[in-house]
Structures are given as C-alpha cells and as structure tokens.
Amino acid sequence: MGVIATPPPSVQGPSSQVPSSAPIPPGPVQDAYLQAVQQEMQDKGYLVARFDALMDWARTGSLWPMTFGLACCAVEMIHAYMARYDLDRFGVIPRPSPRQSDVMIVAGTVCNKMAPALRKVYDQMAEPRWVISMGSCANGGGYYHYSYSVVRGVDRIVPVDIYVPGCPPTAEALVYGVLQLQKKIKNGNRLIRT
C-alpha cells in the first residue's frame, strides 16, 4: 500500500513531481519520505496534516451502514456479515438508526410506495453519506423493470456512489463494493481505477 501525502521540503528528488493526492510508490523515495516524517515526529512530538485527508482516512475504517434489505439481495448482504466474509473486520458495523449511519446499502426491489420512505431515511442520515446500490433490482429495476409499481433504479430517488451488479450479487461482490467505497472515500470521493 502506498503512502498518500505531500512530501516535506527536506525530501528532494522525483517525489517533488508527485501530485499531492497521488500515492508515492514503494522504494527509496517513499523510504526517504517516511524517515522525514519520523524525524519530524521525534523533533516536534506532533505531525501536521491536512484535516480533510485525516478525516477521509478515519472514515474509511469506520463505515456504519444502514441496511435497507428489501428482497433476496438482503440474504446475501446478511452473508457478508457472517464469519466467512466478516465485514466487521473492515470496520463496517451495521447500525439500526439512520442518524448513526453514514452508508446506506439498498438491497432489492424498490417499489413506488417504498420510495418516499427510502428518501426519508436517506435525508435523516448525517453528512457525509454514501449509498451502495446492491443487485439488479436496486440498480435498474431488474426482473421487474417493466412493472408499473417498481422504481427503475434507486438512483432516481437518492444519489448512488457504488453499484454492485448481480441477481443476487454474491457476498464477495458486496465486500468488493464496500472496499471500492472505502477507496473512493480515501481518494476524496473520486474513484481512481488502478
């Protein structure tokens, strides 16, 4: 895993050409950067960092989702929290209240009658908040796309950050979606493909 930061002025070389949000690749430049940071910690006893970068780093390890299980995708979402996949190890702990949550996982078919309740729960969540759309039904209506009573994608109600495809998607797919959301948060709400 690369270090993401702006190298201190004491570190010269190719690192000065690295943008502040780009990871510093492992090697002598990263080693020099880490030594400079350790020296600064020993000299001053504290480290100066950008607050928003520090908050984004902290948020990646403490995502508290509001689970909104509406259909068969909810069973796979439950599997992701069990011992085999264990989303808790990534700091993802489900919360019973939207006021305590910062992520909403919408798993399943959203009907027109459920849409106002979904929006109300989303509005009750504190900022910053993210949405994971799980499964074909939540992504675009799925099997029931042409039904008069089905919303053709949860993104018509709330803004979606991560789409997890599948019918139903596996627990591994949800874990991957959560990891992608953590990467997006860490990179300042923009997903950089690697």
UniProtKB/Swiss-Prot annotation:
Cofactor: [4Fe-4S] cluster
Keyword Cytoplasm listed: no
Membrane-crossing segments per the record: none
Assembly and interaction partners: NDH-1 is composed of 14 different subunits. Subunits NuoB, C, D, E, F, and G constitute the peripheral sector of the complex.
Record EC number: 7.1.1.-
SUPFAM superfamilies noted in UniProt: HydA/Nqo6-like
Keywords annotated in UniProt: 4Fe-4S, Cell inner membrane, Cell membrane, Iron, Iron-sulfur, Membrane, Metal-binding, NAD, Quinone, Translocase, Transport, Ubiquinone
HAMAP family: NDH1_NuoB
Entry-linked Gene3D superfamilies: 3.40.50.12280
Gene label: nuoB
UniProt-listed InterPro entries: NADH_UbQ_OxRdtase-like_20kDa, NADH_UQ_OxRdtase_20Kd_su
Gene Ontology CC terms: plasma membrane; respiratory chain complex I
Keyword Translocase recorded: yes
Protein name: NADH-quinone oxidoreductase subunit B
Cofactor, how bound (note): Binds 1 [4Fe-4S] cluster.
Similarity comment: Belongs to the complex I 20 kDa subunit family.
Region (Disordered): 1-24
Membrane topology, record value: Peripheral membrane protein
Primary localization class, coarse: membrane
The organism's place on the tree of life at top rank: Bacteria
Chain intervals with Low complexity compositional bias: 12-21
Pfam families: Oxidored_q6
Record: residues binding [4Fe-4S] cluster: C72, C73, C137, C167
Biased composition (Pro residues): 1-11
Residue ranges of coiled coil: none
An MF annotation (GO) of this entry: iron ion binding
Known function: NDH-1 shuttles electrons from NADH, via FMN and iron-sulfur (Fe-S) centers, to quinones in the respiratory chain. The immediate electron acceptor for the enzyme in this species is believed to be ubiquinone. Couples the redox reaction to proton translocation (for every two electrons transferred, four hydrogen ions are translocated across the cytoplasmic membrane), and thus conserves the redox energy in a proton gradient.
